[in-house]
Amino acid sequence: MANSRSGDSMTERIVRVLDTFTTERTMQTATEIAERTGLPSSTAHRIVGDLVTAGLLERDEEMRIRLGMRLWELALRGSSALRLRQAALPHMEQVQTVIREHTQLAVLEHEEALFLERLSHPDAGANITRIAGRLPLHASSSGLVLLAHADPALRERVLSLPLRAVSQETVTDAAVLRRLLTTIRRQGYVVAPGSIEQVSTGVAVPVRDRGEVVAALSVVLPRESAPAPAVDALLAAARGIEQDLRSGR
């Protein structure tokens, strides 16, 4: 791909355009995209036009831009995330019948926890996670499980960075976090009260595929709820997911 005067390749500029979309910002104008990418207006408009033609972006009747169905279609073809989600969903539903709060599936992606699925009871308490949303690894129960079982080099890289406090109870001391990760690996789950929201407790367990941790399965409970039933339900669900992944269901 040809480079721009700034040194960015066309691929990098396309990624910058696509990265302006978030779970909260699903519609934009081409001018807003140009401003958020820092690309020249003519360049951003041209890239947006090309992506619309290819079906990767779509325009509505008011000329606002959104992600296109073609992008979704391509993302699902042969996706390991789709296979994982399909294996996990029946077991997540079983957890929901017991817990009746929020049940979530997350994977490690670019040093963050990326949420592939979330089931929520209508009367469930507070929860900021969204499908296709991300949370810091050190500040969520799912992220803590993923970080505990991550490649040691990645784990040390995360521990060497400033650990942002999402709530007053987020673990931001690297030494304390390192000890917590060791405990998670030893006991096979984490209970993280108040790490994201003080009114909630996150409980998470690892999900393995042929021995390798590929995801975290978690629930978000009201702070006053006992975590033991959630731990039992999650561990049983994780075993079921692992069996289905092994059998190729």
Protein language model regions, located:
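Sensor-regulatory modules in signal-transduction proteins
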Residues: 207-209
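Juxtadomain coupling helices with adjacent low-complexity linkers
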Residues: 174, 180, 187, 198, ...
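Short, basic/aromatic recognition patches
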Residues: 87-95, 158-203, 240-243
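Amphipathic alpha-helical effector-binding/dimerization core
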Residues: 63-161
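Short amphipathic alpha-helical signal-transduction/dimerization elements
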Residues: 22, 143, 147, 151, ...
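N-terminal helix-turn-helix
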Residues: 1-81, 242-247
